[in-house]
Amino acid sequence: MARENGESSSSWKKQAEDIKKIFEFKETLGTGAFSEVVLAEEKATGKLFAVKCIPKKALKGKESSIENEIAVLRKIKHENIVALEDIYESPNHLYLVMQLVSGGELFDRIVEKGFYTEKDASTLIRQVLDAVYYLHRMGIVHRDLKPENLLYYSQDEESKIMISDFGLSKMEGKGDVMSTACGTPGYVAPEVLAQKPYSKAVDCWSIGVIAYILLCGYPPFYDENDSKLFEQILKAEYEFDSPYWDDISDSAKDFIRNLMEKDPNKRYTCEQAARHPWIAGDTALSKNIHESVSAQIRKNFAKSKWRQAFNATAVVRHMRRLQLGSSLDSSNASVSSNLSLASQKDCLAPSTLCSFLSSSSGVAGVGAERRPRPTTVTTGHTGSK
């Protein structure tokens, strides 16, 4: 393994000839092409963890991606971010000991609730903003924020939300800009699709998209044709469709507009968004919008297909949904000058740690069951042009 800031990898990897002397492996949570995840109890403490077991033979030629992921995860200590607790190395395996989260995925919780309001959505987004603001202060850009990467810590009704999946994360360099076109198209910022250098502002755009979905249950951008989809995003063309947005506050819409601002220089930062009245004040409404939102989530995010199209890291319902190690061959997005997805394999090398740390990988809309946006009279609200 390479060095991080001059630090030898041997200094942060613990040697373990037999990992089972340290952990009792309870059950397999998931398997993939390159790794296995097990529910494990640390013998010395009795604590439960999700241990990701990666054969070294699967890492050959992919060391740099592993190092990038670990470099990111090792820096992060935040209550709303899934933590890397430890790293062990045996002669044949690398073991990543991750914080165990068992509360399930965001969409599942919303659908299962009988009551859901703007205030609930505001509370969720506030936690995301706090976590992403922390990342940005650390010089880390997530680059792939989406609902599927938001997990509940526990089954408790008041459980906090957790951000997972740092397979596309990047440490900002001195120039504070990046240029690799990657992420999930439905959530990616216009400047990324335009192949322009970009910064942490891309995460703020994604938070705006997430907020949009949390309030209506469907994505702001949709088209059967990928080029047209990308054109919508490039122009920041989205609407607050009636009747789905009729009962949503103007404050919520203003919050979204400021995050889904085409110009990254005008776009809200996490700090600015956290001060918006919809987050920091009392403008988020308490009206129950569960019926409409949950119906749209069921319609637009069908599990059987949707989950195949995203990187996700989750221990859900009996801690059995986590699957790791799916190949990225079908998921690495590269946006060409004509906004085609024809070269999906070219964006990120298959060595990207999503291959090892996340579940079925892919790109929104590619291989997923696409469903049309509601065909109704629109309110006339659009994003900045």
UniProtKB/Swiss-Prot annotation:
UniProt entry tagged with the keyword Acetylation: no
Residue positions where Phosphoserine is found in the record: S122
Pfam families cross-referenced by the UniProt entry: Pkinase (PF00069)
GO biological process: inflammatory response; negative regulation of apoptotic process; nervous system development; positive regulation of apoptotic process; positive regulation of CREB transcription factor activity; positive regulation of neuron projection development; positive regulation of neutrophil chemotaxis; positive regulation of phagocytosis
Keyword ATP-binding among record annotations: yes
Molecular function terms, GO-annotated: ATP binding; calcium/calmodulin-dependent protein kinase activity; calmodulin binding; protein serine kinase activity
Stretches the record annotates as Disordered: 363-385
Activity regulation (UniProt): Activated by Ca(2+)/calmodulin. Binding of calmodulin results in conformational change that relieves intrasteric autoinhibition and allows phosphorylation of Thr-180 within the activation loop by CaMKK1 or CaMKK2. Phosphorylation of Thr-180 results in several fold increase in total activity. Unlike CaMK4, may be unable to exhibit autonomous activity after Ca(2+)/calmodulin activation.
Regulation: induction: Down-regulated upon cholesterol-rich diet.
Binding residues annotated for ATP, in chain numbering: L29, G30, T31, G32, A33, F34, S35, E36, V37, K52
Source taxon at top rank: Eukaryota
Tissue-level expression: Expressed ubiquitously with high levels in brain and low levels in kidney. Isoform 2 is highly expressed in brain compared to other tissues. In hematopoietic cell lines predominant expression was detected in T and EC cells.
Entry keywords, A to Z: Allosteric enzyme, ATP-binding, Calcium, Calmodulin-binding, Cytoplasm, Inflammatory response, Isopeptide bond, Kinase, Neurogenesis, Nucleotide-binding, Nucleus, Phosphoprotein, Serine/threonine-protein kinase, Transferase, Ubl conjugation
Occurrences of domain Protein kinase (ranges): 23-279
CDD domains per the UniProt record, alphabetical: STKc_CaMKI_delta
Matches recorded under InterPro entries: Kinase-like_dom_sf, Prot_kinase_dom, Protein_kinase_ATP_BS, Ser/Thr_kinase_AS
Motif Nuclear export signal per record, residues: 318-324
Catalytic EC class: transferase
Listed GO CC annotations: cytoplasm; nucleus
Effect of K52D: Catalytically inactive form
Biased composition (Polar residues): 375-385
Region (Autoinhibitory domain): 279-319
Main location: cytoplasm
Segments for region (Calmodulin-binding): 299-320
Family stated for the protein in its record: Belongs to the protein kinase superfamily. CAMK Ser/Thr protein kinase family. CaMK subfamily.
Name this polypeptide is given: Calcium/calmodulin-dependent protein kinase type 1D
Gene source species: Mus musculus
Gene name of the record: Camk1d
